[in-house]
């Protein structure tokens, strides 16, 4: 059975406050039956130097991605992962990670592809937990198999593909959440990160540039609903919004904001993102600070 929502007034203004928990709530419910805590970091070694008691590690690269095909794991693989991590289908899953929950939001988005009903983020993530000097451990919990059922992914509601993006150009909101250097075409990869093989630089025509990190404050918590509404005030209730970055990890954070904190009904994450678009043949690309227009073919 799902655990109760966090009643904190700091969350109540969001469209779906039940998708977030505070550190106080997690501390109070630690060890409760039906609670699964997951750490998913960009730096996959952080879990091993200390983590929230009872938390299991999910490696975004090796656990969530198919080892051969460039795609996510399938239903059988996800069920095996959940069994191995001791997570049941009806558990309340709280995910947290480093860097303002960047990769934690990615893991939550993948859980959503498989229809796990109750999955939440720890507001502020790992960094805030440590800043508040809350309890950590080196102990890795022993988990038993849960009999997690095989449920195949349902990509359509929240995942966009290249042809979906081509179909909405100049008709629906498209948001590029990457760094300014990536958006303008000055570089093909994130600053301070290695080159990943994109052949072209720039952005998709008509894409508005709103870096993902603008949705979080200095502590790593999400900004208030009022601040977020101002940031994304160009999105109308009936819009079909698509967000993208390089492989869908940063845009998962923006997807979470739009879907769960602002209550936008139709938001999809284009996880192929610039790794696909920047290598694709005959797709339109714009360089510079302006969104640009769709070229006439």
From Swiss-Prot:
One annotated GO molecular function: thiosulfate-cyanide sulfurtransferase activity
Gene that this polypeptide is encoded by: sseA
Binding site for substrate: 250
Catalysis: reaction(s): thiosulfate + hydrogen cyanide = thiocyanate + sulfite + 2 H(+)
Domain Rhodanese span(s) in chain numbering: 31-138, 168-286
Coiled-coil regions, chain positions: none
SUPFAM superfamilies membership: Rhodanese/Cell cycle control phosphatase (SSF52821)
SMART domains from the UniProt entry: RHOD
Catalytic residue list: 245 (cysteine persulfide intermediate)
EC number: 2.8.1.1
Source superkingdom: Bacteria
Domain free text: Contains two rhodanese domains with different primary structures but with near identical secondary structure conformations suggesting a common evolutionary origin. Only the C-terminal rhodanese domain contains the catalytic cysteine residue.
Keywords: Repeat, Transferase
Protein name: Putative thiosulfate sulfurtransferase SseA
InterPro entries: Rhodanese-like_dom, Rhodanese-like_dom_sf, Thiosulfate_sulfurtransferase, Thiosulphate_STrfase_CS
């Amino acid at each position: 059975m799902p655990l109760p929502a966090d009643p904190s007034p700091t969350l109540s203004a969001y469209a779906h406050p039940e998708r977030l928990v505070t550190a106080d709530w997690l501390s109070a419910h630690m060890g409760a039956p039906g609670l699964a805590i997951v750490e998913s970091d960009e730096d996959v070694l952080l879990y091993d130097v200390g983590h929230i008691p009872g938390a299991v590690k999910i490696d975004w690269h090796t656990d969530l991605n198919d080892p051969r095909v460039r795609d996510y794991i399938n239903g059988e693989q996800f069920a095996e992962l959940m069994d191995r991590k001791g997570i049941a289908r009806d558990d309340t899953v709280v995910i947290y990670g480093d860097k303002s929950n960047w990769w934690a939001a990615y893991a939550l988005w993948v859980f959503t592809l498989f229809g796990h009903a109750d999955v939440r983020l720890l507001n502020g993530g790992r960094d805030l937990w440590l800043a508040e000097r809350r309890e950590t451990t080196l102990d890795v919990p022993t988990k038993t198999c849960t009999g997690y059922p095989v449920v195949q992914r349902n990509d359509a509601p929240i995942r966009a593909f290249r042809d979906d993006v081509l179909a909405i150009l100049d008709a629906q909101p498209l948001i590029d959440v990457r760094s300014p250097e990536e958006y303008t075409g000055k570089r093909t990869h994130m600053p301070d990160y290695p080159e990943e093989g994109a052949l072209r630089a720039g952005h998709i025509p008509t894409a508005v540039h709103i870096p993902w990190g603008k949705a979080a404050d200095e502590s790593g918590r999400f900004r208030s609903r009022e601040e977020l509404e101002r940031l994304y005030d160009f999105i109308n209730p009936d819009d079909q919004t698509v967000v993208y970055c390089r492989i869908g990890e940063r845009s998962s954070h923006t997807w979470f904001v739009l879907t769960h904190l602002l209550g936008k009904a139709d938001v999809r994450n284009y996880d192929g993102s610039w790794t696909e678009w920047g290598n694709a043949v005959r797709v339109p690309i714009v360089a510079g600070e302006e969104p640009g227009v769709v070229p006439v073919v």
